[in-house]
């Protein structure tokens, strides 16, 4: 939607904050361990592990740390009892929020997530309370400068769902969850390697916010992202560009 920043600004803020806090290493160590536990330690036959490996290397994580995390998950060493959990709720302004976590203590994590929602004027919901407002999608992002026509043609030939161009010249290719890795591989074979690629929860509806609402929602997202057990936070917040320009 022209004139709106929607979810991209929140994602980019999150990446900067993760890097600033050093949390990104912990995030990818957990993802590597869980991915290896679920699908084995060979990235050639485990697409989730391959994606986590690419992300970890992109974050300048050492190969030694990566190998230890994979070995722990694959069973070569004693693994931590880490499980994946997703919490759902509503934030200020009726914004739907999904919080993906990895934790070795679900009671601790649930209490921390509930506290964040309560403190910021939101409500932690039950399973399914907002999940129906999101779709699990693949997202492959390209920096400004890529040939839009050629990329669009290659993406459609690879059976991508949608190609979205932004005012700054960047482009996102969206895929179904099941075809993400196939589309990514096809684009790379055609000469288009994305600057970022990930599985996301894409909202199917949006909640437009004014300045006050945006500030409150971003406070909630910041508080959730500060929690050690939180991996990803998704919302259907729609922040118009004129409002985003007023945010600190």
Curated annotation (Swiss-Prot):
It is found in: Cytoplasm. InterPro entries: Integrase-like_N (IPR017856), TACO1_YebC-like_2nd/3rd_dom (IPR048300), TACO1_YebC_N (IPR049083), Transcrip_reg_TACO1-like (IPR002876), Transcrip_reg_TACO1-like_dom3 (IPR026564), YebC-like (IPR029072). It comes from the Bacteria. One of its GO terms (cellular component) is cytosol. Transmembrane segments: none annotated. Its main location: cytoplasm. Pfam families: TACO1_YebC_N, Transcrip_reg. Keywords: Cytoplasm, DNA-binding, Transcription, Transcription regulation. GO terms for biological process: regulation of DNA-templated transcription. The keyword Transcription applies. One of its GO terms (molecular function) is DNA binding. NCBIfam families: PRK00110.1 (NF001030), PRK12378.1 (NF009044), YebC/PmpR family DNA-binding transcriptional regulator (TIGR01033). Belongs to the TACO1 family. HAMAP family: Transcrip_reg_TACO1. This is Probable transcriptional regulatory protein Pfl01_4410. It comes from Pseudomonas fluorescens (strain Pf0-1).
């Amino acid at each position: 939607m022209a004139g709106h920043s929607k979810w991209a600004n929140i994602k980019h803020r999150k990446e900067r904050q993760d890097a600033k806090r050093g949390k990104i290493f912990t995030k990818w160590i957990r993802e590597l361990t869980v991915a290896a536990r679920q699908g084995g330690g060979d990235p050639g036959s485990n697409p989730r592990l391959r994606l986590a490996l690419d992300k970890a290397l992109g974050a300048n994580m050492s190969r030694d740390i990566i190998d230890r995390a994979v070995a722990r998950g694959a069973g070569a060493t004693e693994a931590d009892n880490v499980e994946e959990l997703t919490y759902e709720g509503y934030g200020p302004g009726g914004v739907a929020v999904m919080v993906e976590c990895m934790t070795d203590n679900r009671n601790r994590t649930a209490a921390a997530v509930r506290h964040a929602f309560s403190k910021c004027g939101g409500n932690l919901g039950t399973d399914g309370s907002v999940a129906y407002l999101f779709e699990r999608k693949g997202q492959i992002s390209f920096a400004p400068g890529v040939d839009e026509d050629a990329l669009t043609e290659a993406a459609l030939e690879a059976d991508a769902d949608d190609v979205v161009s932004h005012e700054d010249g960047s482009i996102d290719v969206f895929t179904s969850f099941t075809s993400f890795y196939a589309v990514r591989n096809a684009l790379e074979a055609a000469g288009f390697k994305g600057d970022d690629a990930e599985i996301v929860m894409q909202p199917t509806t949006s909640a437009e916010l004014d300045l006050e609402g945006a500030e409150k929602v971003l406070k909630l997202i910041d508080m959730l992202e500060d929690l050690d057990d939180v991996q990803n936070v998704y919302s259907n917040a729609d922040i118009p560009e004129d409002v985003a320009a007023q945010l600190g």
